Amino acid sequence: MSVDTANPTSPMMETHEQIFAQDPDFWKNYRRGRPQVPYSFFQRIYNYHQGHSGRFETVHDAGAGNGVYSKELRSKFHHVIVSDVVAENVRQAEERLGTEGYSFRVGKMEELDEIPAASVDMVFVMNAMHWADDQTRAMRAIAAQLRPGGTFACAGFGPARFRDARVQDVWERISQQGGRLLLQTANQPVDTINVMVRSQDHYNVAPLDERLFRQRALRIYLNQETGGLTGLLPPERRGEVTEPDHEGPHDQITFEHDDEWRFDMDLDGFKEHFRTFPHAFRDPEAFTSLWQEIEELVRQGSRLDGAWPVTLILATRTNA
């Protein structure tokens, strides 16, 4: 099983921003190879927001990439602020979405000071919160943007979790090999290790200061009965993790199963999913023996099916 890596990345030292500075072809494949998000997921967010008397005027789609979910948000909100740390991603978003009902910003979510205080009804962060090195600072910036009673909606999903334990084992080793390749070119390896640990398992992000967010925020773990998000962190680098646990003492933790997030891939679909990760565009030979293991498992009758694990965090801004 060969994987076409037509967009090789330079072996120079890279920042977090450079890792996900990808061209339009990457984002097209990203939409195909990542979960097709069911509408019930968005409806749960909208219902939470409405249930806490939230307005549907302005939403900030932070860390939006090239606006993967911005059009969906525009179907409910009058105005969507689309922001990303990568200028090229924002340019692609503006080109694809147009400007009616949208505005565009380039910058880190913890540094977008030009967004007026208490001017946003919802801050929506999908698959991006783990990139903020200073989680506390990022949450202060998000809280500052939100109107009293506004909603912070954050989710992490993307890496598949396969039903067959043998397939899942190989997928974990593929992911960890990708993590090794990314760490070889990371300009701040410890920071990149912490990004990896935030983005795996139960998605360890978003410390919720109860002076800024009401108690009993929701942390909902979907389809995580056998494990959370498959991570990139190589086991030999776990001793370098410095990230604290961000679950709060009063956060409401629930585990649920949702069949709408199930998938069933063939080998081409597996390849397409792999190519949604930045390490796919590195050294192809580093994965050769792992592809052979997957092919052999499929020949033996293993199915490439399972469910996407999802973490959803919902919190309400205090009135202070």
UniProtKB/Swiss-Prot annotation:
Assigned keywords, A-Z: Methyltransferase, S-adenosyl-L-methionine, Transferase
Pfam (any one): Methyltransf_11
Comp. bias regions, Basic and acidic residues: 235-252
S-adenosyl-L-methionine in keyword set: yes
Gene Ontology molecular function terms on file: S-adenosylmethionine-dependent methyltransferase activity
GO biological process, one term: methylation
SUPFAM superfamilies: S-adenosyl-L-methionine-dependent methyltransferases
Listed EC numbers: 2.1.1.-
Location of the region described as Methyltransferase domain in the Swiss-Prot/TrEMBL record: 61-154
Pathway where it operates: Secondary metabolite biosynthesis
Family membership: Belongs to the methyltransferase superfamily.
Entry function: Methyltransferase; part of the gene cluster that mediates the biosynthesis of geodin, an intermediate in the biosynthesis of other natural products. The pathway begins with the synthesis of atrochrysone thioester by the polyketide synthase (PKS) gedC. The atrochrysone carboxyl ACP thioesterase gedB then breaks the thioester bond and releases the atrochrysone carboxylic acid from gedC. The atrochrysone carboxylic acid is then converted to atrochrysone which is further transformed into emodinanthrone.
Protein name (record): Methyltransferase gedG
Species of origin: Aspergillus terreus (strain NIH 2624 / FGSC A1156)
